[in-house]
Regions:
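A short acidic/basic microdomain associated with nuclease active sites
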Residues: 63, 79-114
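Glycine-rich, often proline-containing surface loops adjacent to acidic residues and nearby aromatics
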Residues: 52-56, 127-136
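Active-site beta-strand-loop-beta-strand hairpin of nuclease catalytic cores
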Residues: 115-132
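Glycine- and small hydrophobic-enriched segments that form the cores of compact globular domains
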Residues: 101, 115-116, 143, 178
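Hydrophobic, Leu/Ile/Phe/Ala-enriched alpha-helical segments that form helix-helix packing faces
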Residues: 72-84, 155-163, 218
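Domain-level recognition of nuclease-like catalytic cores that cleave nucleotide substrates
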Residues: 168-220
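Catalytic cores of nucleic-acid endonucleases
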Residues: 137-184
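Nuclease-adjacent, charged terminal/linker segments that flank catalytic cores
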Residues: 1-71
């Protein structure tokens, strides 16, 4: 899957939507706040948006903040013939699903658990197996990106102690970040470092392009 091309396509769509949304309350509030912040009138900014495509980019929504990468992954996984009962899980709340110390828990059961636990993104079934997946698309290095890397390591750590039968945990890691060397451990790539943390029996690390063949192999 080419996430970068999908991002470019979506951001062009969002750019076109700026002028379509000029009369909406949210856009007018955004323009008003921007105008007040920099000392311009509402009318000046609105006219500039209409006539200047480059300036219009300031007000276009960032696809990355619209769950683009998770949505693309969800569309792809759910389209696979072998996948059944696919669900995108809530990121929080009582119906979210968490993995902690080998236990799969819904949000309403987390009262006495650590608040740092990240929810699982997707769940589906194949044949008699249930798959729980954490998905990350991480492009460049940085503090926030390193936190995502740590989230995956924590997910794999918590999966080790799970004794649920016919249950598989997947860390789906996409983006150039995972192809970079891990300077702390010396691993050739970060994804190889993550793969060393799995037992390759009930937990696995892979990218989305290898998911289809992986599911075919593990369910045969």
């Amino acid at each position: 899957m080419n996430y970068k091309d999908q991002y470019k396509s979506k951001i062009q769509e969002n750019l076109k939507n700026v002028t379509k949304e000029l009369e909406t309350r949210n856009m007018q509030l955004k323009i008003s706040n921007w105008a007040n912040k920099f000392g311009y009138s509402f009318g000046q900014i609105k006219e500039k948006i209409i006539n200047d495509e480059i300036f219009r980019c300031v007000f276009a929504k960032d696809p990355a903040k619209q769950n683009l990468y998770q949505n693309l992954a969800a569309q792809y996984i759910s389209s696979l013939d072998i996948v059944e009962n696919f669900k995108v899980l809530p990121s929080g709340g009582k119906n979210a699903i968490y993995l902690t110390n080998g236990k799969i828990l819904q949000g309403h059961l987390l009262k006495n658990q650590s608040k740092d636990i990240k929810s699982i993104d997707f769940v589906w079934t194949c044949n008699n197996l249930t798959f729980y997946a954490s998905h990350k698309y991480t492009e460049v290095s940085g503090g926030a990106q390193d936190n995502q890397y740590k989230d995956i390591q924590d997910f794999l750590h918590h999966s080790r102690d799970c004794n649920e039968k016919n249950t598989i945990f997947l860390a789906i890691c996409d983006g150039d970040y995972y192809l970079q060397k891990d300077s702390q451990t010396g691993d050739e790539t970060k994804i190889k470092r993550l793969q060393r943390l799995t037992d390759n029996k009930t937990s696995f690390v892979l990218n989305i392009d290898s998911l289809s063949s992986f599911l075919q192999n593990i369910t045969n």
